Curated annotation (Swiss-Prot):
Name under which the protein is recorded: Bifunctional uridylyltransferase/uridylyl-removing enzyme
Cited InterPro entries: ACT-like_dom_sf, ACT_dom, HD/PDEase_dom, HD_domain, NT_sf, PII_UdlTrfase/GS_AdlTrfase, UTase/UR
Stated family: Belongs to the GlnD family.
Organism annotation: Psychrobacter cryohalolentis (strain ATCC BAA-1226 / DSM 17306 / VKM B-2378 / K5)
Record comment regarding domains: Has four distinct domains: an N-terminal nucleotidyltransferase (NT) domain responsible for UTase activity, a central HD domain that encodes UR activity, and two C-terminal ACT domains that seem to have a role in glutamine sensing.
Domain of life: Bacteria
The gene coding this protein: glnD
């Protein structure tokens, strides 16, 4: 049984009612009489919830409160059971599941079982129906099962029902049935079969949540590190030890007092979050959505934030949640494995038990696990903490026996400055980073059991640290370890096709630990304020020098830490078709060694930041920047080094491709004449493959391709671009240039629910627009539906032929975006070479954003010459090359007016935009 002492909580007493007047009134056909028969119970239940909330505000322990609500429901169900005469039958009423454990949050499911030794007769069935109807009328909405013992035997073959029966607790009724639910589970499931099915269930559950505790909107019940991870410990052990409470496992010497305290503390923390989720939503809500994170942070006392750090409170709250989740998932994994190793393995035949083989005097290999040779290994040989992980890499061992993990967790607390300063320990730590085999798994275990955070205290500070945005999908520590895992994948032939250039470069780098160290430190100074890259540079150099690395190697790690964002920002935010941009980047990089390391680190970093961030488009940008920079740094005499050289090189490459394909529809002379009309800018911005596609489309569209007729119809062609992103579509437009072309195009895309990933807007020498777009289809039908393709083409053609002010659609801002405040910032830089202003726009990403920008450009008579579209989570960071309608630079007054108009247009934050 559980603790039912509710005296300290001051709960409102249950209303008085009797069996006679309740059943008589309830069976009446008079609605008013039935309402009176509820005797204020619905209002009382609401008051109980309010009493519990007030008690939590007073500081009453949440564990008492979830037990108190279970007690209240116990009392109510027992009285109602009597009121309907069910206590005079052979029925037994059980609380099952979480309610059976005595754990009820404000709106938790109330799982009950009505059990009979035989089939239920008509009279009893009628009474049960009336009871259930009343329970729904008073607002309990129970999850009710009515079963005979034989029914229960069959139902228990479902492991989820078996789990609920393990928690069954008799409330009232037939005492002879008290132990039947537990006996049924014991009869239907062996310890091994039940363990296996629950572990498989946990693995499937983990996969549903991306196998990480660090989701942006975690489900605190079912996600890794959620309440279910505590429940599974109870399920697999209660089946064997025949105990009812988690603390009983301490008395069985299965669980230590320290582990029980850690589980209890973490469970209390999750229960408190769950209480507030239920209170705020008025329902059984377990998903910690952005909608509730800020308010719950405040309710739980995380109220420290400043104007320059508006997300400080919610980030601290989520950091504590993620740390709690990691502790729960770590303990759950360790304890379920401990159950297998101590209980299941002991029942296996000798030939099926893992064999022990000595590695050295301190460690053995047991099957596919490593284990300390005796329980004093870490105490007598502190260096063995790091030695163990090195041996795992050298011997290809991925896992650790649980008795060793328990000892490791205790030993890790002894890692102090003296330990870190020990040359033997420093050598072992660096040796671990040099050993690539299972490096991610070894570092992950180091992190989960406290070794990494104690050896590098700054790493402990970022453990669980999440930035409150949609761009960074993982905590800093998880992101760092994922980055290192991706680095290792660059050596795996299975991933070579995804990263051909990066893989070849990485495999040629001899000192791979340089990149691993840069990965370890690149985000280590986040959350402190200031420039985290510069702070991380200082710490990384100090760490490397303290570990005996050369000054050159330490400086390389520091340089990579400081400039780890340089390449991605240059490729995504600047015009890398401009030789001056590439030359400036090359000057900052300095040499090919820096470039190779930075390229590999950047690709891994982008892949580890957000699974949706890396795509073929970004890969192409990065590869283009790398290749152009490498030519400059190597002073390659055959490489294009200026604008005209780059144009010539692109044309030459496109001609080679033209000669290698079936080009019977394209005459070479016509191709060259067309290319002369397209202008230099086109060959700076487009790649050879797309040039070939555009050329064929134009030449097969005679009115434009062969006559350059100003009255010719617009050309719109589409093709699949699945390499870029799922459901991505390339659209190429060739039409007479006009001032509102960008605006009407964006409006059409918005009307058809198409998101713009990339845009290249170019004007040919004969005043024809050559516009290329990469679109993401929100509905997912454009690639497979010819009618949708034709509709898009026709809408664009009609819009180009009848260029009026575009009509904007009004769509709801997605739920997640509503919780982020991204200030709209606009800056202008003047480009002397093009006589254009480069407008950078940072704002909240929202439906119809580019359509609204286009409308402002139209109203302000702005000509758009090129655009770079970048979406980073909730933040849009776009660049536009603009002038007035006469291709002249904008005046200072015009820039000010444009900026004001854009900010006014984009500052609308309603349910609809």
């Amino acid at each position: 049984m559980f603790n039912c002492d509710v005296t300290a909580i001051d709960l409102t007493p249950m209303p008085l009612f009797s069996a006679d007047n309740m059943t008589t009134a309830f069976l009446s056909t008079d609605t008013s009489v039935v309402e009176k028969s509820l005797f204020g119970i619905p209002e009382w239940l609401l008051q109980i919830n309010d009493d519990i909330s007030r008690a939590l505000e007073r500081g009453v322990n949440i564990r008492q409160l979830v037990s108190a609500r279970a007690c209240v429901i116990d009392d109510l169900l027992i009285e109602l059971f009597k009121c309907f005469g069910l206590d005079k039958t052979d029925l037994a009423l059980f609380a099952t599941g979480g309610y059976g454990r005595g754990e009820l949050s404000l709106h938790s499911d109330i799982d009950i079982l009505l059990l009979m030794p035989h089939d239920i007769n008509a009279d009893t069935s009628s009474k049960i129906d009336n009871l259930v109807a009343l329970l729904w009328d008073i607002g309990l909405e129970p999850a009710l099962s009515v079963r005979s013992v034989s029914d229960c035997l069959e139902a228990a073959l479902d492991h989820t029902i078996a789990s609920a029966l393990l928690e069954a607790r008799l409330l009232i009724g037939n005492d002879a049935l008290q132990n039947v639910p537990h006996q049924i589970v014991n009869n239907q499931w062996s310890p091994r079969s039940f363990y296996d099915v629950k572990i498989d269930e946990a693995k499937a559950r983990y996969l549903q949540h991306n196998a990480t505790e660090y989701n942006l909107e975690p489900n605190i019940k079912t996600a890794p590190g959620g309440l279910r991870d505590i429940h599974i410990i109870g399920w697999v052990t209660k089946r064997y030890f025949r105990v009812s409470k988690l603390y009983d496992l301490v008395q069985q010497n299965f669980l230590t007092e320290k582990e029980f305290d850690e589980l209890s503390f973490s469970e209390n923390y999750l229960w408190q979050i769950r209480h507030y989720l239920h209170e705020l939503t008025g329902r059984n809500e377990n998903k910690l959505l952005f909608d509730y994170q800020r308010e719950i942070a405040q309710l739980m006392g995380y109220d420290t934030q400043t104007d320059d750090q508006p997300n400080a409170a919610v980030e601290r709250f989520m950091r504590d949640y993620y740390r709690c989740a990691m502790q729960i998932s770590t303990l759950s994994e360790m304890l379920t494995n401990h159950y297998y190793e101590t209980i299941i393995e002991a029942q296996l035949p000798d030939e099926e038990r893992p064999k022990k083989q000595p590695i050295n005097a301190r460690f053995n290999q047991v099957g596919d696990q490593i284990a300390m040779a005796h329980h004093r290994v870490f105490a007598q040989h502190p260096e063995s903490i790091l030695e163990m992980f090195l041996l795992m890499g050298q011997y290809g061992i991925k896992n650790v026996r649980t008795h060793t993990l328990r000892a490791l967790k205790i030993a890790a607390r002894g890692i102090d400055q003296a330990y870190r300063d020990n040359p033997t320990h420093q050598t072992l730590f660096l040796a671990n980073l040099k050993e690539q085999n299972y490096l991610f798994h070894r570092l992950r275990t180091m992190n989960r059991y406290g070794v990494l955070g104690n050896y590098i205290p700054a790493f402990a500070q970022v453990t669980g640290l999440m930035q409150y945005d949609l761009f960074h999908r993982y905590t800093v520590d998880a992101h760092t370890l994922f980055l290192i895992r991706i680095l290792h994948r660059f050596t795996d032939p299975h991933f070579y096709e995804d990263f051909p250039l990066v893989s070849s470069i990485f495999q040629r780098i001899e000192r791979k630990e340089i990149l691993v160290l840069a990965a370890m430190f690149h985000d280590i100074a986040k959350g402190r304020g200031g420039n985290h890259s510069q702070l991380g540079e200082i710490e990384s150099i100090e760490f490397c020098l303290a570990h005996g690395m050369s000054t050159a190697d330490a400086n390389l790690v520091g340089w990579l830490t400081r400039y780890h964002l340089l390449m991605s920002m240059t490729a995504q935010k600047k015009d890398i078709s401009d030789p001056e941009v590439v030359t400036l980047f090359a000057d900052l990089v300095g040499n090919v060694t820096h470039l190779n390391h930075l390229y590999v680190l950047t690709v891994a970093d982008m892949n580890a930041t957000n699974p949706q961030l890396w795509n073929s488009w970004r890969a192409t940008l990065m590869k283009q920047l790398y290749s152009q920079t490498r030519r400059i740094l190597r002073a390659d005499i055959d490489a294009p080094t200026n604008r005209q050289d780059m144009i010539s090189a692109t044309r030459k490459q496109a001609l080679v491709m033209l000669d290698n394909v079936d080009n019977q529809h394209m005459n070479r002379d016509e191709v060259l004449r067309l290319w002369d009309d397209l202008g230099d800018e086109y060959f700076l911005r487009e790649i050879a493959e797309d040039i070939l596609w555009h050329t064929e489309a134009i030449l097969n569209h005679p009115p434009i391709g062969r006559a350059s007729n100003a009255d010719s119809p617009p050309l719109v062609v589409l093709r699949e671009h699945r390499e870029l992103a799922l459901d991505a579509v390339q659209v190429f437009v060739y039409t007479q240039d006009q001032v509102n072309l960008f605006a009407v195009t964006m409006a059409v895309f918005d009307q058809m629910n198409l998101d713009v990933l990339d845009a290249r807007i170019i004007t040919a020498t004969r005043d024809f627009a050559l516009d290329s777009y990469v679109l993401l289809d929100r509905s997912g039908t454009l690639l497979v539906d010819s009618d949708s393709q034709q509709e898009l083409k026709q809408r664009l053609i009609d819009a180009f032929k009848n260029p009026t002010a575009p009509k904007l659609t009004h769509k709801r801002i997605p739920r997640q975006l509503k919780h982020f405040d991204v200030a709209t910032t606009i800056n202008f830089d003047f480009n002397d070479a093009s006589n254009q202003h480069i407008m950078s726009l940072e704002t909240l990403d929202q439906p119809g954003l580019l359509a609204r920008v286009g409308q402002v450009f139209l109203q302000q008579q702005i000509e758009v010459h090129a655009a770079r579209i970048t979406t980073l989570g909730e933040r849009a960071e776009d660049m536009f090359y603009i002038s007035d309608q006469n291709d002249q630079a904008l005046s200072a007054d015009k820039l000010k007016t444009l900026k004001t108009a854009l900010i006014d247009s984009l500052s609308v934050r309603n349910d609809r935009v």
